[in-house]
Amino acid sequence: MLGNKMLSLPEQQPTLKIINSALVDLPVPANISIWWNFGSLLGLCLLIQIVIGLFLAMHYTAWVELAFSSVANICRDVNYGWLLRTVHANGASFFFICIYFHIGRGMYYGSFHYFETWMTGIALLFLVMAAAFLGYVLPWGQMSFWGATVITNLVSAVPYIGNDVVQWLWGGFAVDNPTLTRFFTFHFLIPFLVAGLTMIHLLFLHQSGSNNPLGINANLDKLPFHPYFTIKDTVGFMVLIFFLVTLSLTSPYLLGDPDNFIPANPLVTPAHIQPEWYFLFAYAILRSIPNKLGGVIALVSSILILVSLPFTFKPKFRGLEFYSVAQPLFWSWVSVFLLLTWIGARPVEDPYNFLGQILTCAYFSYFVFTPIVINLNDKIV
């Protein structure tokens, strides 16, 4: 009798019913591959970042005279503070690795045809990028200060209102204490907005159902999410945590910038100002345009162009796996993305400038030529 009551408990309680339908009894295509693991890995990354961020915020001081010292204090005097800081910093890198794999899978298998899910995903990408940029400023090292100065100053390229908006962002006529205070405020707030928008993202996904590698209706071959896919996701969690902890314990500052170990000094400019490695592709696109406003437009377009995919890609088959001509274009685009990341970390001189301009053209060309190639292929078929 008690067993029957326990079994029916998720059906009786409204909250448990929602959780049960989303995480236990959710019908999932049986043939989804490991590429579908990255959504759950992103959820894990977000949870790790929020929890560790809360503990770091307890010890951080958002004041230009004390910010750098407070980060040093966290690493030296707070119990396991060094581990919290390095896992938080490297966790951001793993977050973006999972994001880029997640987006790449969506592009390859045609998940962008789920319009609402894709658009909320792009909004999530912008929010996560904003949070990561703001977090990069908080240690108040040399690269933090000059990165904040250079990137926010790009807003001044907007006609008429640009300079006023920059001063509003800075809270004055230069990057100073008001800037750091508001950056910390928004860095603390945005992850909770990301968590809320993630719920909406999942709501749209569960309305349409998940895509699958074949891109066909899988209603006849679906399994409950638990236990098969919970075990698959748990394996992914273990692998991610293993690599994150290993990196944080063996080479914690490998993905950081050495200049950030120097306190911020407005009078000394670093030899090469650059953002975090996961923004370097966009930074290379920005640098490849000689005009300031044109560079800003190209920078924003490098992400915003993902919005065009549901409108320009109208194939007979959902994914690229059935288009042998389009597959080389996709993997060439992935190579261009990686090369742009490398170019973004190089000095602003030839041949890197010239290579960056060629790669920028190649980056945007994918979104123009691939739909044309697919349409021609469909007509031949």
UniProtKB/Swiss-Prot annotation:
GO terms for biological process: mitochondrial electron transport, ubiquinol to cytochrome c. It is a multi-pass membrane protein. GO terms for molecular function: metal ion binding; ubiquinol-cytochrome-c reductase activity. Binds 2 heme b groups non-covalently. The chain crosses the membrane at residues 38-58, 82-103, 118-138, 183-203, 231-251, 293-313, 325-345, 352-372. Its cofactor is heme b. Heme b b566 binds at residues 102, 201. It is found in: Mitochondrion inner membrane. It comes from the Eukaryota. Heme b b562 binds at residues 88, 187. GO terms for cellular component: mitochondrial inner membrane; respiratory chain complex III. A ubiquinone binds at residue 206. Keywords: Electron transport, Heme, Iron, Membrane, Metal-binding, Mitochondrion, Mitochondrion inner membrane, Respiratory chain, Transmembrane, Transmembrane helix, Transport, Ubiquinone. InterPro entries: Cyt_b/b6_C, Cyt_b/b6_C_sf, Cyt_b/b6_N, Cytb/b6-like_sf, Cytochrome_b, Cytochrome_b_C_euk/bac, Cytochrome_b_N_euk/bac, Di-haem_cyt_TM. Heme 1 (or BL or b562) is low-potential and absorbs at about 562 nm, and heme 2 (or BH or b566) is high-potential and absorbs at about 566 nm. Component of the ubiquinol-cytochrome c reductase complex (complex III or cytochrome b-c1 complex) that is part of the mitochondrial respiratory chain. The b-c1 complex mediates electron transfer from ubiquinol to cytochrome c. Contributes to the generation of a proton gradient across the mitochondrial membrane that is then used for ATP synthesis. Belongs to the cytochrome b family. PANTHER family: CYTOCHROME B. The main subunits of complex b-c1 are: cytochrome b, cytochrome c1 and the Rieske protein. This is Cytochrome b. The gene is MT-CYB.
